[in-house]
């Protein structure tokens, strides 16, 4: 991806990631509206994604900022996967030269499952769907934290 001119804060397109060791959920959102939509989840092996699959999404959506969910324990302390998520965030920045921030993602999986169940019952709870909905929630949380929406 070539270097681009980034939009000012409040007008950016933001790509969100729900990091996992087997699957990484992806969502795209707009700061202006504070809304987000899920994209296609990417499979990972021990937290390492197929970077070509991520590049397809990055090249299509041209985000100005990326946000990676940071899995923390309920008391706010780090766990093993927290460090892997931070490493993933650093690799995203190194691959695409796009600013990357992290966002607390405590309880997003439970929230994602509840939303998906509400929309379509148990049949709607596939792993990729949960990861993608988690990515949507991570972005929505980022927008709320950043702009108080």
UniProtKB/Swiss-Prot annotation:
It comes from the Bacteria. It is found in: Cytoplasm. Its main location: cytoplasm. GO terms for molecular function: nuclease activity. GO terms for biological process: rRNA 5'-end processing. It is an enzyme of class 3 (hydrolase). Keywords: Cytoplasm, Hydrolase, Nuclease, Ribosome biogenesis. CDD domains: YqgF. SUPFAM superfamilies: Ribonuclease H-like. Its EC number is 3.1.-.-. GO terms for cellular component: cytosol. Belongs to the YqgF nuclease family. Could be a nuclease involved in processing of the 5'-end of pre-16S rRNA. HAMAP family: Nuclease_YqgF. PANTHER family: POLYNUCLEOTIDYL TRANSFERASE, RIBONUCLEASE H-LIKE SUPERFAMILY PROTEIN. This is Putative pre-16S rRNA nuclease. It comes from Pseudoalteromonas translucida (strain TAC 125).
């Amino acid at each position: 991806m070539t270097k681009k001119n980034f939009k000012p804060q409040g007008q950016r397109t933001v790509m969100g990631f729900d990091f996992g060791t087997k699957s990484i959920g992806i969502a795209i959102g707009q700061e202006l509206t504070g809304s987000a939509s899920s994209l296609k989840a990417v499979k990972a092996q021990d937290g390492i994604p197929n970077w070509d699959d991520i590049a397809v999404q990055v090249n299509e959506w041209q985000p100005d900022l990326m946000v990676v969910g940071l899995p923390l324990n309920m008391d706010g302390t780090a766990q093993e996967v927290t460090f892997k998520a931070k490493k993933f965030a650093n690799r995203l920045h190194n691959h695409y030269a796009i600013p990357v921030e992290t966002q607390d993602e405590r309880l997003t999986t439970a929230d994602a499952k509840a939303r998906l169940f509400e929309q379509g019952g148990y049949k709607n709870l596939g792993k990729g769907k949960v990861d993608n909905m988690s990515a949507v929630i991570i972005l929505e949380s980022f927008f709320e934290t950043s702009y108080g929406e």
